[in-house]
Amino acid sequence: MCELDQLSEMGSKAAVNRRQFAAIGAMAALAAGVKAQAQAAGGLSERNVTFAAPGGTLDGFFVHPASGKHPGVILWPDIAGLRDAKKVMARRLATAGYSVLVPNPFYRSAPAPQFKDFEDWRANGGMQKVGPWMQQNTPAAVADTTKAVVAWLDQQASVDTAKGIGVQGYCMSGPWTIIGAAAVPGRIKAAASFHGGGLVGDAP
């Protein structure tokens, strides 16, 4: 699991060593290759989107196969928010035959991107910046947002409403997958939390 104290410690250690830099370079090359392959095949359609949601206007990134209807997927980013790395992940899912929305998890506070990448988050006081934003994402707020996201997805021509929606979350947003599935059980049929933080707590 990924906990807030671990994230705070990461934020105080912003330096990147040579091995980390090499890994980042390799990931960037892979990301570029995936995007170029998809674009060359002409198989994907993508766009930035905005729509009304509880507490404000939600902005996000939507990508799907260029033709046909496909199961919807909600991809909640981690604490560094909607950024290029998450768009790459969404494109990879879309190439597998899904209509993927990456919502800005902090839309109530600031439009995306809030950070260029995770290193930008670490080096520029990311934890201090997002702390107040995170407080707005209560379980009730996340449930309400998920309902709006599902409603929006179901209005898209590329989404197959006869099939269930999947939701995945990372670190901070890991619990959101469970909250979302409970909020819209008739539509969300699969939930995956990756190194989710705050999955359990002391409060009843």
Model-predicted segments: where are they?
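N-terminal secretory signal peptides
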Residues: 1-16
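Short amphipathic alpha-helix adjacent to the substrate-entry channel of hydrolases
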Residues: 84-103, 107-112
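Primarily recognizes the serine-hydrolase "nucleophile elbow" in alpha/beta-hydrolase
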Residues: 146-204
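Gly/Ser-rich "nucleophile elbow"/oxyanion-hole loop immediately N-terminal to the catalytic nucleophile
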Residues: 118-166
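N-terminal export leaders
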Residues: 16-30
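N-terminal cap/lid segment of alpha/beta-hydrolase-fold proteins
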Residues: 37-68
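Short beta-strand element of the alpha/beta-hydrolase
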Residues: 70-78
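Flexible "cap/lid" loop of the alpha/beta hydrolase fold
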Residues: 112-120, 197-204
